C-alpha cells in the first residue's frame, strides 16, 4: 500500500534551534502542555493539537502537562474533565503527575494583576461593553479610554472591591495599559479581568472576578515551566500580548509560543457549538454517536488509537489552514485493521441456501485462518451443514451481464473455505419473492479446490451455518453530512445533514465465534467491511455491531 509522505514539522525545527547550544532553552528539558477547555468532548481536531503537544514532548524526551482551562466559569463540567482524561489515555499518552486546572492559579493571577497595576501597566476601566466597542477605534483611529490615567491607588482599591463582590457584572474591568494606537487590536489595552457572579465548578463562589484567557494562559505556562506553548493559528495575533504578559510580571520562565494550523476535515463540523446542537436537538444519539467526530464517537465506531495517531502524523504540521479528506482518516483505519482484524463470516441480508445433495442431519467442521496477513493469529473452527445463510444479493433468479454469483444453471461458485456449489434453482412465495436458494455441492472439492483441478468461473461467496449461528443487529454508518463543507460561511449546517447516514439491519446472521465479542475487538466481515461490537448496546443476549469502515477504499494516496 502506498505510503503518505509525512509533512516536515516546522515546530520541531524551531525547538531544535532553541535547545541547541546558544539557543534560548539550551540545556533545558522540552516542556509542553495540552490545555483543553472542559466544556465538551475532544474531537478529531483537538486530537491533532493533543498529538502535537504530547508527541513533541515524546520526541525530544521531554514532558507534557495536562491542564484543564477552566477559567471560564459558565461552561465547565466534571463530566468533560473525566472524558478528556480517558480519551488522552486511550490514545496512549500520559501526563504523569502533571495534571492541573487553570483555576488552581486564580490567586497567582490576581497577584500578578495587582503587580501590573502597581507598575502602572494596568487600570480599572468603567466603560460598558457597548462603549468599549464604540471607543475601540479603527486602523486609522486610536482607541479611547477616559479611565486610562486613573491613579494607581484608585485602581488598586477598585480592583480589591471588584474581588470583594461590591460591583455588578460588567460594571468594571481591569485593562492592561499597552498601546491604544496599535495596529494589532489585541494590544489596544485589552481587558484582562472581568466581573462574573457565577458558580465555578471547582472554586464554588470564592471568586466573582475571572482572568481573561490571554492574561491567565501565559502566566500558567510560565509557572509550570513550559518551554514551548504550542497553539492553533488563531492565536498568532495574540502572541505579542502573550509575550507582553510574561515580560511584565515576575514569572520564573518565559515560554515561546508557536502556532500551527487547525485540522479541517470535509463532510463534518468541528465547532463545539454545532456539535452540541446536534446532540441537544436529537440529530445524533449523543456525544459518542459513531457518526460524531468526537474521540468517544470514533472509538465507539471502531477507530483505533494507532489509526488516529497515524492520521495526525501523516497530515503533518502546517502553517496554513487546510482541509483533509475524510477518506484519508478511513484509509488510516483500514490500513491498521487490515493487519490486525480477525476475518469472520457474517450475513447482513440473509437468504436461505439449501445444499440439496448434502446429507440431512450431517454436519462437519472446517479450519479457517483468522488473518491471512498474520500467520500467528491462528485458525478457528466453523461448522457446515445442509442449511446455510448467504447474502440475498449473492443470488439472482435472472442474472444480469457479468454477474458471476449464484443463479440457476450459472457457473460454479466457491463457498469460502468449504465446497464448490452449483445453483439449481430457487423457491418463491406467493408474491414471487425468493425465499430459498437451491444448490448442489461437489463432495470432492472440500476446502474449495476441485479434485480434478478444473477452473471455477464463479465468485467466492461467504456463508454462515444456519444450524449454528447467532443473530445480530448491524449498524452501517456513512457521512453525517451530504455537503463536503457544511461549516462554510452562510450555510445552515443542519440543512446539510445526510438523512441516510445510519442504516440499521436486524436479523443478521454471524458465526457463533462472535457470541462473546466485546469492544474494542475489531473484525473484518468478509466481503463487507470492518466491524466492531458497539461498546454501549452490544451484549451476549443482543449482539450489535457497528461498521467502522468499508472494504472499498475511495481515497487515493499519492505515491
Description of each model-found segment:
Residues 21-26, 55-63, 89-96, 222, ...:
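Secondary-structure transition/capping motifs at alpha-helix termini
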Amino acid at each position: 500500500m502506498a505510503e503518505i509522505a509525512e509533512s516536515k514539522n516546522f515546530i520541531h525545527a524551531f525547538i531544535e534551534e532553541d535547545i541547541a547550544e546558544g539557543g534560548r532553552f539550551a540545556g533545558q528539558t522540552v516542556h509542553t502542555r495540552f490545555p483543553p477547555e472542559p466544556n465538551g468532548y475532544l474531537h478529531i481536531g483537538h486530537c491533532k493539537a493533543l498529538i502535537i503537544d504530547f508527541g513533541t514532548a515524546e520526541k525530544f524526551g521531554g514532558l507534557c502537562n495536562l491542564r484543564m482551562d477552566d477559567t471560564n466559569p459558565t461552561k465547565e463540567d466534571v463530566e468533560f474533565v473525566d472524558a478528556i482524561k480517558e480519551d488522552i489515555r486511550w490514545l496512549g499518552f500520559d501526563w504523569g503527575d502533571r495534571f492541573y486546572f487553570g483555576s488552581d492559579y486564580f490567586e497567582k493571577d490576581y497577584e500578578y494583576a495587582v503587580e501590573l497595576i502597581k507598575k502602572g501597566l494596568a487600570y480599572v476601566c468603567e466603560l460598558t461593553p457597548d462603549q468599549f466597542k464604540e471607543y475601540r477605534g479603527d486602523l486609522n483611529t486610536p482607541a479611547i479610554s477616559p479611565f486610562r490615567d486613573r491613579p494607581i491607588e484608585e485602581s488598586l482599591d477598585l480592583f480589591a472591591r471588584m474581588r470583594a463582590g461590591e460591583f455588578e457584572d460588567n460594571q468594571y474591568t481591569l485593562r492592561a495599559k499597552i498601546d491604544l494606537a496599535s495596529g494589532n487590536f489585541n494590544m489596544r489595552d485589552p481587558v484582562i479581568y472581568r466581573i462574573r457572579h457565577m458558580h465555578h465548578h471547582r472554586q464554588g463562589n470564592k471568586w466573582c472576578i475571572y482572568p481573561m484567557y490571554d492574561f491567565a494562559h501565559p502566566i500558567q505556562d510560565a509557572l509550570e515551566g513550559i518551554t514551548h506553548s504550542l497553539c492553533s493559528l488563531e492565536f498568532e495575533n495574540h502572541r505579542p500580548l502573550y509575550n507582553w504578559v510574561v515580560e511584565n510580571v515576575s514569572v520564573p520562565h518565559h515560554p515561546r509560543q508557536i502556532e500551527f494550523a487547525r485540522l479541517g476535515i470535509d463532510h463534518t463540523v468541528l465547532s463545539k457549538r454545532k456539535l452540541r446542537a446536534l446532540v441537544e436537538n436529537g440529530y445524533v444519539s449523543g456525544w459518542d454517536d459513531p457518526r460524531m467526530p468526537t474521540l468517544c464517537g470514533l472509538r465507539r465506531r471502531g477507530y483505533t488509537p494507532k489509526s488516529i495517531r497515524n492520521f495526525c502524523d501523516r497530515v503533518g504540521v502546517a502553517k496554513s489552514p487546510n482541509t483533509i479528506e475524510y477518506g484519508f482518516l478511513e484509509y488510516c483505519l483500514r490500513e491498521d485493521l487490515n493487519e490486525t482484524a480477525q476475518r469472520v463470516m457474517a450475513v447482513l441480508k440473509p437468504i436461505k441456501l439449501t445444499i440439496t445433495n448434502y446429507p440431512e442431519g450431517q454436519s462437519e467442521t472446517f479450519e479457517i485462518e483468522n488473518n491471512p496477513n498474520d500467520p500467528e493469529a491462528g485458525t478457528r473452527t466453523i461448522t457446515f451443514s445442509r442449511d446455510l445463510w448467504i447474502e440475498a444479493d449473492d443470488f439472482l433468479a435472472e442474472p444480469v451481464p457479468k454477474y458471476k454469483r449464484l443463479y440457476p444453471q450459472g457457473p460454479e461458485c466457491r463457498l469460502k473455505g468449504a465446497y464448490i456449489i452449483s445453483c439449481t434453482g430457487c423457491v418463491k412465495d406467493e408474491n414471487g419473492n425468493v425465499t430459498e436458494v437451491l444448490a448442489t455441492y461437489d463432495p470432492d472439492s472440500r476446502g474449495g479446490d476441485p479434485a480434478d483441478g478444473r477452473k471455477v468461473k464463479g465468485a467466492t461467496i461467504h456463508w454462515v451455518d444456519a444450524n449454528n449461528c447467532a443473530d445480530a443487529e448491524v449498524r452501517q454508518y456513512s457521512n453525517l453530512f451530504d455537503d463536503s463543507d457544511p461549516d462554510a460561511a452562510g450555510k445552515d449546517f443542519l440543512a446539510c445533514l445526510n438523512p441516510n447516514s445510519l442504516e440499521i439491519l436486524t436479523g443478521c446472521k454471524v458465526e457463533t465465534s462472535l457470541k462473546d465479542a466485546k469492544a474494542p475487538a475489531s473484525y473484518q466481515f468478509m466481503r463487507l467491511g470492518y466491524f466492531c461490537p458497539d461498546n454501549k448496546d452490544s451484549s451476549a443476549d443482543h449482539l450489535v455491531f457497528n461498521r467502522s469502515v468499508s472494504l472499498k477504499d475511495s481515497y487515493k494516496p499519492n505515491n
